[in-house]
Amino acid sequence: MKTKLTPIAAAAAVALAGAVAVPAFAQTAAAPAAAASAAKAEEVQQVIVTGIRASMQSSINQKRNAESHVEVLTAEDIGKLPDKNVADSLAHVSGVTISSSSGTEGGFDESDRVSMRGTGPSLTQTLINGHNIASGDWFVLGQTGTVGRSVSYTLLPSEVVSSVVVHKTSEASLVEGGVAGSIDIITRRPLEFKQSLTVSASAGLVYSDLPAKTDGQFNALVGWKNDVGTFGVLVQGFSETRHLRRDGVEVLGFDTIQATDPSAQAGLPGLVAGVKYPDLIGEALFLQERKRTGGTFDLELKPSNDITLDLNGFLSNQEATNINRNYMFFGRKLGGAQVPTSYTVSDGYLTSATYDNAGGMMAGIYDQISRPGAGSHSQYLDFDGKFQVTDKFKLTTQLGTSTGYGKSPNQDVAETVVGATQASFSLNGPHNAASWATNATSTSQGTVGLNSTFNTDSGDGWIFGDGNIKVNDSEKWGQLDGKYDIEAGPLVDLKFGARGSRHERSLWNVIGQGPTAVNWGAADYAAACGGATTDFRCIPPASGNYPSNFGKGLNATLPPMPWTFSPAQLAAYNAQYANRDPVGRADYSADFGLKEDVEAAYLQGDLEGESWSGNVGLRAVRTKEHVQNYEAHAVAQPGDITTSAFGNFGLKTTDHTYNDLLPSANFNLKLNKEMNLRFAASRTMTRADYSQLAGSIAYGAVDDVNLIGSGTGGNPDLKPVTSNNFDSSFEWYLGQNNMFSVSAFFMDVTSYIGLASVHKTLNYIDNAHPNGVAVDFDLTVPVNTSAKVHGVEFHYEAPIWGGFGAVANLSLTSSSTANHDPMLGTSKNSYNLGGYFENDWLNARLQWNHRSSFYSGQDRNSAYFQDATSDLSASLGYTISKNFNITLEGRNLNKPKLRYYTQADQPRASYVNGSQYYLTAHFSY
């Protein structure tokens, strides 16, 4: 396969060759400059900071001395912020945005994903100590739906961090994988501590006001090194429990009025075929207990000044059992089938309606889903070696392995129907929660389920959803890097290296459960229950209700306090009536396996002159991709699996090899002692998301099997995302803790991943067609296209008076794609405003973060946007003695509303998660 040099690659190669060719006498000060640079780098590594202002100055120093455009957060700075995982801390960096969900499940109260410069989370690479980390998601939609390259930061507590380096421009020596940039989390090492013995511990409580629960939080670290500093051991552990509650109103898709529907034939003005109406409107109550436990260890050996050996590891396990209830308006049964007594139509959408039917109608449907044992996990083991072979030649090695998973072993489900003679809804615009009501009693169970007067198409106690879900993720890597001091003109040194890795991601043996009786109508239900068609003895009695303050702050009118089943009742109900046959209910459409073998090599030259420095380099990468997934066939083909209720499936294998050349150049011009001017150009790449390469086919309900349905799927032929990036920045260091910077960037994403439509015939199963029927679908699938992103970032921090100071930054971003679809993750503006105070015994910080609306992905075959959101956090610390202090922290103090809407300016969801308060005692020795 031939590889063609891009313009950036050619420029970098010429610059590097020219630098090598310059005679040594061209700059007699090269050796002193190199020595000064090395000393400067060593000084940065050995900085020990305490206090807010000292840590901010340390971050400023590291940014100032870096050869490329970076932002740095130190452990002390993170510790003085009201942050509970690394993503919370990164939210304060200009150009970095966070989201509190992995995909389209809606946000929670903790930061989850990190993205840079107006792109999606998958285009930002997360490293720990320079290597990748395997990860997993606890939420079922993140496990089977949006399965991206991004890391879940809910597994990364802030306590494990020594520093975080945000690379806004690329270098050849950096591991490839971040189109927009990369984030390197540096963990603590025992020989870095000043004292021979370091002990620190924190114990505290967290109160979450919406669930009204208090839980314990604990963290401890012990670091020891011998007196001569040649051997050290560090052990750290954490255990953090929290209760979550999320109140929400969800609009789950839209259906279309057909010409044959009664509502279209009634002759009412504006109520015609083609008008869309909400499929489901629900009041969704999510409850969860999260327990994050784990720790780190580090063994560091330095037998001489020339050799350092380090073995380190990390483990984080998150138990995330949850229950999701949704009491819903059943628009699918009303919008076309019932003629409204009053209504409004706006821009082709039925935005409100009232229905009256004395004979009764199926006005609502109620889903209760318990996910016991849900969770996520991440761990790694890494060995690093540093060898100063000669005065001029240094070698470093890295060998490691990382594993992770996300799991949902079972979903215990019950779906019941709500009969009524009156029902109504109102959508209330794209930025507000929808409302709905019926004249049924929501607070008590009453006679639930099947009633021939209402409808028997959807029976009582229906069971659905995938189970036996465990997404395994792993990576193994080996790396060898060299650095040779040249001191030839402006060329200070040459860096070179090679890296090999294997990444694997898989999900096999998914079970698409259903009820024990395939046709769960009145007769089958009665047979299963051992009674008449009106006998509901199978249904357990209600065990409780929604909280009385559910939905406070959402400004929606909803049925009050729906009755509930307990998780134990749902488990018992499913144990008796769920069909989880691993053969007949095998859901092969959700299975996939992916393996990537990557080989990379690079050459980089570090440059330095009298008032400038920089680097140029080239990284060559080969990716061998092996994707396996099942393809559905309407007619069985030779070798197909034909035992699944979901149709005929054949295993499909796709292999590709991709070669990429990634040049880079970074230059830092020192205009004077206070001002730096930086320029950078690079070509970057990120491999396609796992769900894009091997995504399962998912489709919505079909009212008429003779019409064309819609759904989504994957594309194993996707090429990696590549981009030509350009960056310039101006930095003005005005004094202690005082700096201003402005930067501009442009990304020409030459191989972005967008969406297109393909036509397929699939085996469709519903209650009316238990054995399946061939239905045509238009599936939205990912394809390679192109995009452009550009923006400007401003940052300012300064002391004000006494112990007071302020930090502020603003990012302005714009993007476009070749197919004119919105670009994932682009917020036109985001900003952070912060203030701090510090003296010998008291420190305080106040932080306001804002992010404007952005495209979040596809949900129910429609573009899905998150509305603008802001959050307020604060921390207060009181120092009792040198070894003991207390902190009080608050997160989400403004009780932010998370709003989502569709591309057609219709509401999708509104959520509130409440506020969280942390009281913690810290001890150190």
Positions of the model-derived regions?
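N-terminal periplasmic "start-of-domain" segments of outer-membrane beta-barrel proteins
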Residues: I48-L81, I133-T144
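Extracytoplasmic beta-strand/coil segments of soluble accessory domains associated
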Residues: A87-G136, K168
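C-terminal beta-signal and adjacent terminal beta-strands/loops
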Residues: D137, V518, S852-G857, G877-Y925
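Outer-membrane beta-barrel translocator/receptor signature
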Residues: Q143-V151, E159-V166, S173-L268, D279, ...
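Outer-membrane beta-barrel transmembrane strands
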Residues: D184-T187, A203-V206, T214-K225, L280-N324, ...
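Solvent-exposed loop segments that connect transmembrane elements
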Residues: D247-E283, I323-Q368, V413-F464, T516-P541, ...
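Outer-membrane beta-barrel signature, preferentially recognizing the C-terminal barrel domain
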Residues: S376-S378, A586, A590-V598, H656, ...
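Gram-negative outer-membrane beta-barrel transporters
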Residues: A744-V749, I753-K760, Y764-D859, N894, ...
